Amino acid sequence: MRIILLGAPGAGKGTQAQFIMEKYGIVQISTGDMLRAAVKSGSELGKQAKDIMDAGKLVTDELVIALVKERIAQDDCRNGFLLDGFPRTIPQADAMKEAGIAVDYVLEFDVPDELIVDRIVGRRVHAASGRVYHIKFNPPKVEGKDDVTGEELTTRKDDQEETVRKRLVEYHQMTAPLIGYYQKEAEAGNTKYAKVDGTQAVADVRADLEKILG
């Protein structure tokens, strides 16, 4: 089973990716992890990626596609894989298709921007332990304090409203067009496309995914 997850940052993809991996025995391929692993392995592609990143440039689509192809040929991808954070643009989706990388399901997590802002901006973190709270959905027992240690909670830079809104604008400009792209692919019989209501409780989203994926 080969799956692509689409949806804005904060739409709940990460939580559900864990569930899909465990239930269906497939691995998650995150382009960030893949690039780091390739650089560490010192492979030919890894060296190319390192040179580009060391120069402060963005890794080209061609190189990422080559890395994806190399990664999915590995043994642990036998049952399938889950692509997270790729493709981000239509040229990347086209390049994947040209490289012969077929996908069984494209799942879109649909959540309105304002709810995403609410979800992310309300997060509070206990830096030392990694415990995450939410002022509305999962508040600490004492406001602003970690339940276990009583230490101060902080807001990550990535979780500040300005940053979140900027990421949403980028998502709508670059990645949202993929929704139309993959709907057309599904109409042509090349993949299956499903829209998931990401505003629901985690367990309800999970139940929807089980219905879709079987």
From Swiss-Prot:
Organism: Citrobacter koseri (strain ATCC BAA-895 / CDC 4225-83 / SGSC4696)
Gene Ontology CC: cytoplasm
Subcellular compartments: Cytoplasm
Family to which the UniProt record says this protein belongs: Belongs to the adenylate kinase family.
Region (LID): 122-159
Protein's UniProt name: Adenylate kinase
Reactions catalysed: AMP + ATP = 2 ADP
Function: Catalyzes the reversible transfer of the terminal phosphate group between ATP and AMP. Plays an important role in cellular energy homeostasis and in adenine nucleotide metabolism.
EC category: transferase
Pathway: Purine metabolism; AMP biosynthesis via salvage pathway; AMP from ADP: step 1/1
Domain notes from UniProt: Consists of three domains, a large central CORE domain and two small peripheral domains, NMPbind and LID, which undergo movements during catalysis. The LID domain closes over the site of phosphoryl transfer upon ATP binding. Assembling and dissambling the active center during each catalytic cycle provides an effective means to prevent ATP hydrolysis.
Domain of life: Bacteria
Binding of ATP, residues: 10-15, 123, 132-133, 200
Complexes and interactors: Monomer.
Main location per the UniProt record: cytoplasm
